[in-house]
Amino acid sequence: ITGTSAGAINAAALACGADNFDRAVRRIARVWRQFHANQVYGADSLSVMRSGARWLTLVSIGWALARWRRMRPQSLLDNKPLEKLLVKMVPLVRLPRLIRKGHLKALAVTASSYSSGEHVTFFESAEPVKPWVRSQRKAARDRITHEHLLASSAIPFIFPAKGIEVDDHIEYFGDGSMRQSAPIAPAIHLGAERILVIGAGRMHEPKNDAAANPTPNYPSLAQIAGHALSNIFLDALAVDVERVQRINQTLSLIPEEKRAHSALRPIELLVIAPSQRLDAVAARHVGDLPTPVRTMLGALGVTSNMADVRGAALASYLLFEAGYTQELMALGRADTLAMRAQV
């Protein structure tokens, strides 16, 4: 099982319940159905004001305070509540035994190093897999910890980077979706030949109405930030799926006796992705956010108007609220049932 960003958390939770997969899925679903923002980050007025004040201070007189590191904000929001939730809900201490008993072949989570610029996949495996090295990305065999999960899901600017030891030194990591050129590769390196890809990308979603009818208004900060984050989080998977499909097509044209001498092998993919635009879904739930967070986003141009999806992409990265997560789960179930024959 491999995962990146929020997918790393889901992957780890599934892996920790690999001896009873159905129970693990139900447990994860129960958490997502009852989710609230305060389980992920400090969403109260004091926490939001404290973070906002630090950023304002940095912008206004940061040049004068540069020598005082403790004044520099590390992120927009504090995700200590998420750390507590992970410790409670993801018992990583079970992994070695599950791997040893054959319930799980491997778990891999990916994060992006701010220190080296490399994209690193951390993995535990039953097989003696040699860590791979490719251009700007590599793998490291390691005991997966909650720090790895926090690093993989540390959305840039929004959540703080996490320090993890790599090759006997500490590097600081952020969200694994950054600079991720080959999200399917870890599963292939770990030996998978049939891969179920569950993503939040744009492969199956309808065309954006805003693209057909662009607004003449200057984009808000929220719209610009949402566009930038969407490019980070949503585009790489679709490109990698197309790459694997092209390689499969090429291999199908090569005679089997010659293909046997190649390191390449065909990979069977089944891709499940949303059939609706997630920013449109998010726009219906912006009003569910805690008032302090909604006020902060409002200053950037996010509105609670369900018809206005322009800033909703940014809000979707903070929308850890039950109304939104339940609608996403219902969408995922419907999209999967629509593909029941392939599944």
Can you annotate each of these PLM segments?
Residues 72, 100-193, 197-228, 310-319:
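Active-site gating loop/helix substructures
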Residues 73, 77, 81, 86, ...:
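C-terminal helical/tail subdomains of lipid-metabolizing enzymes
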Residues 79, 83, 87-90, 106-111:
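Extended catalytic-interface subdomain
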Residues 209-250, 292-296:
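Acidic, Ser/Thr-rich peripheral helices and adjacent loops at domain boundaries
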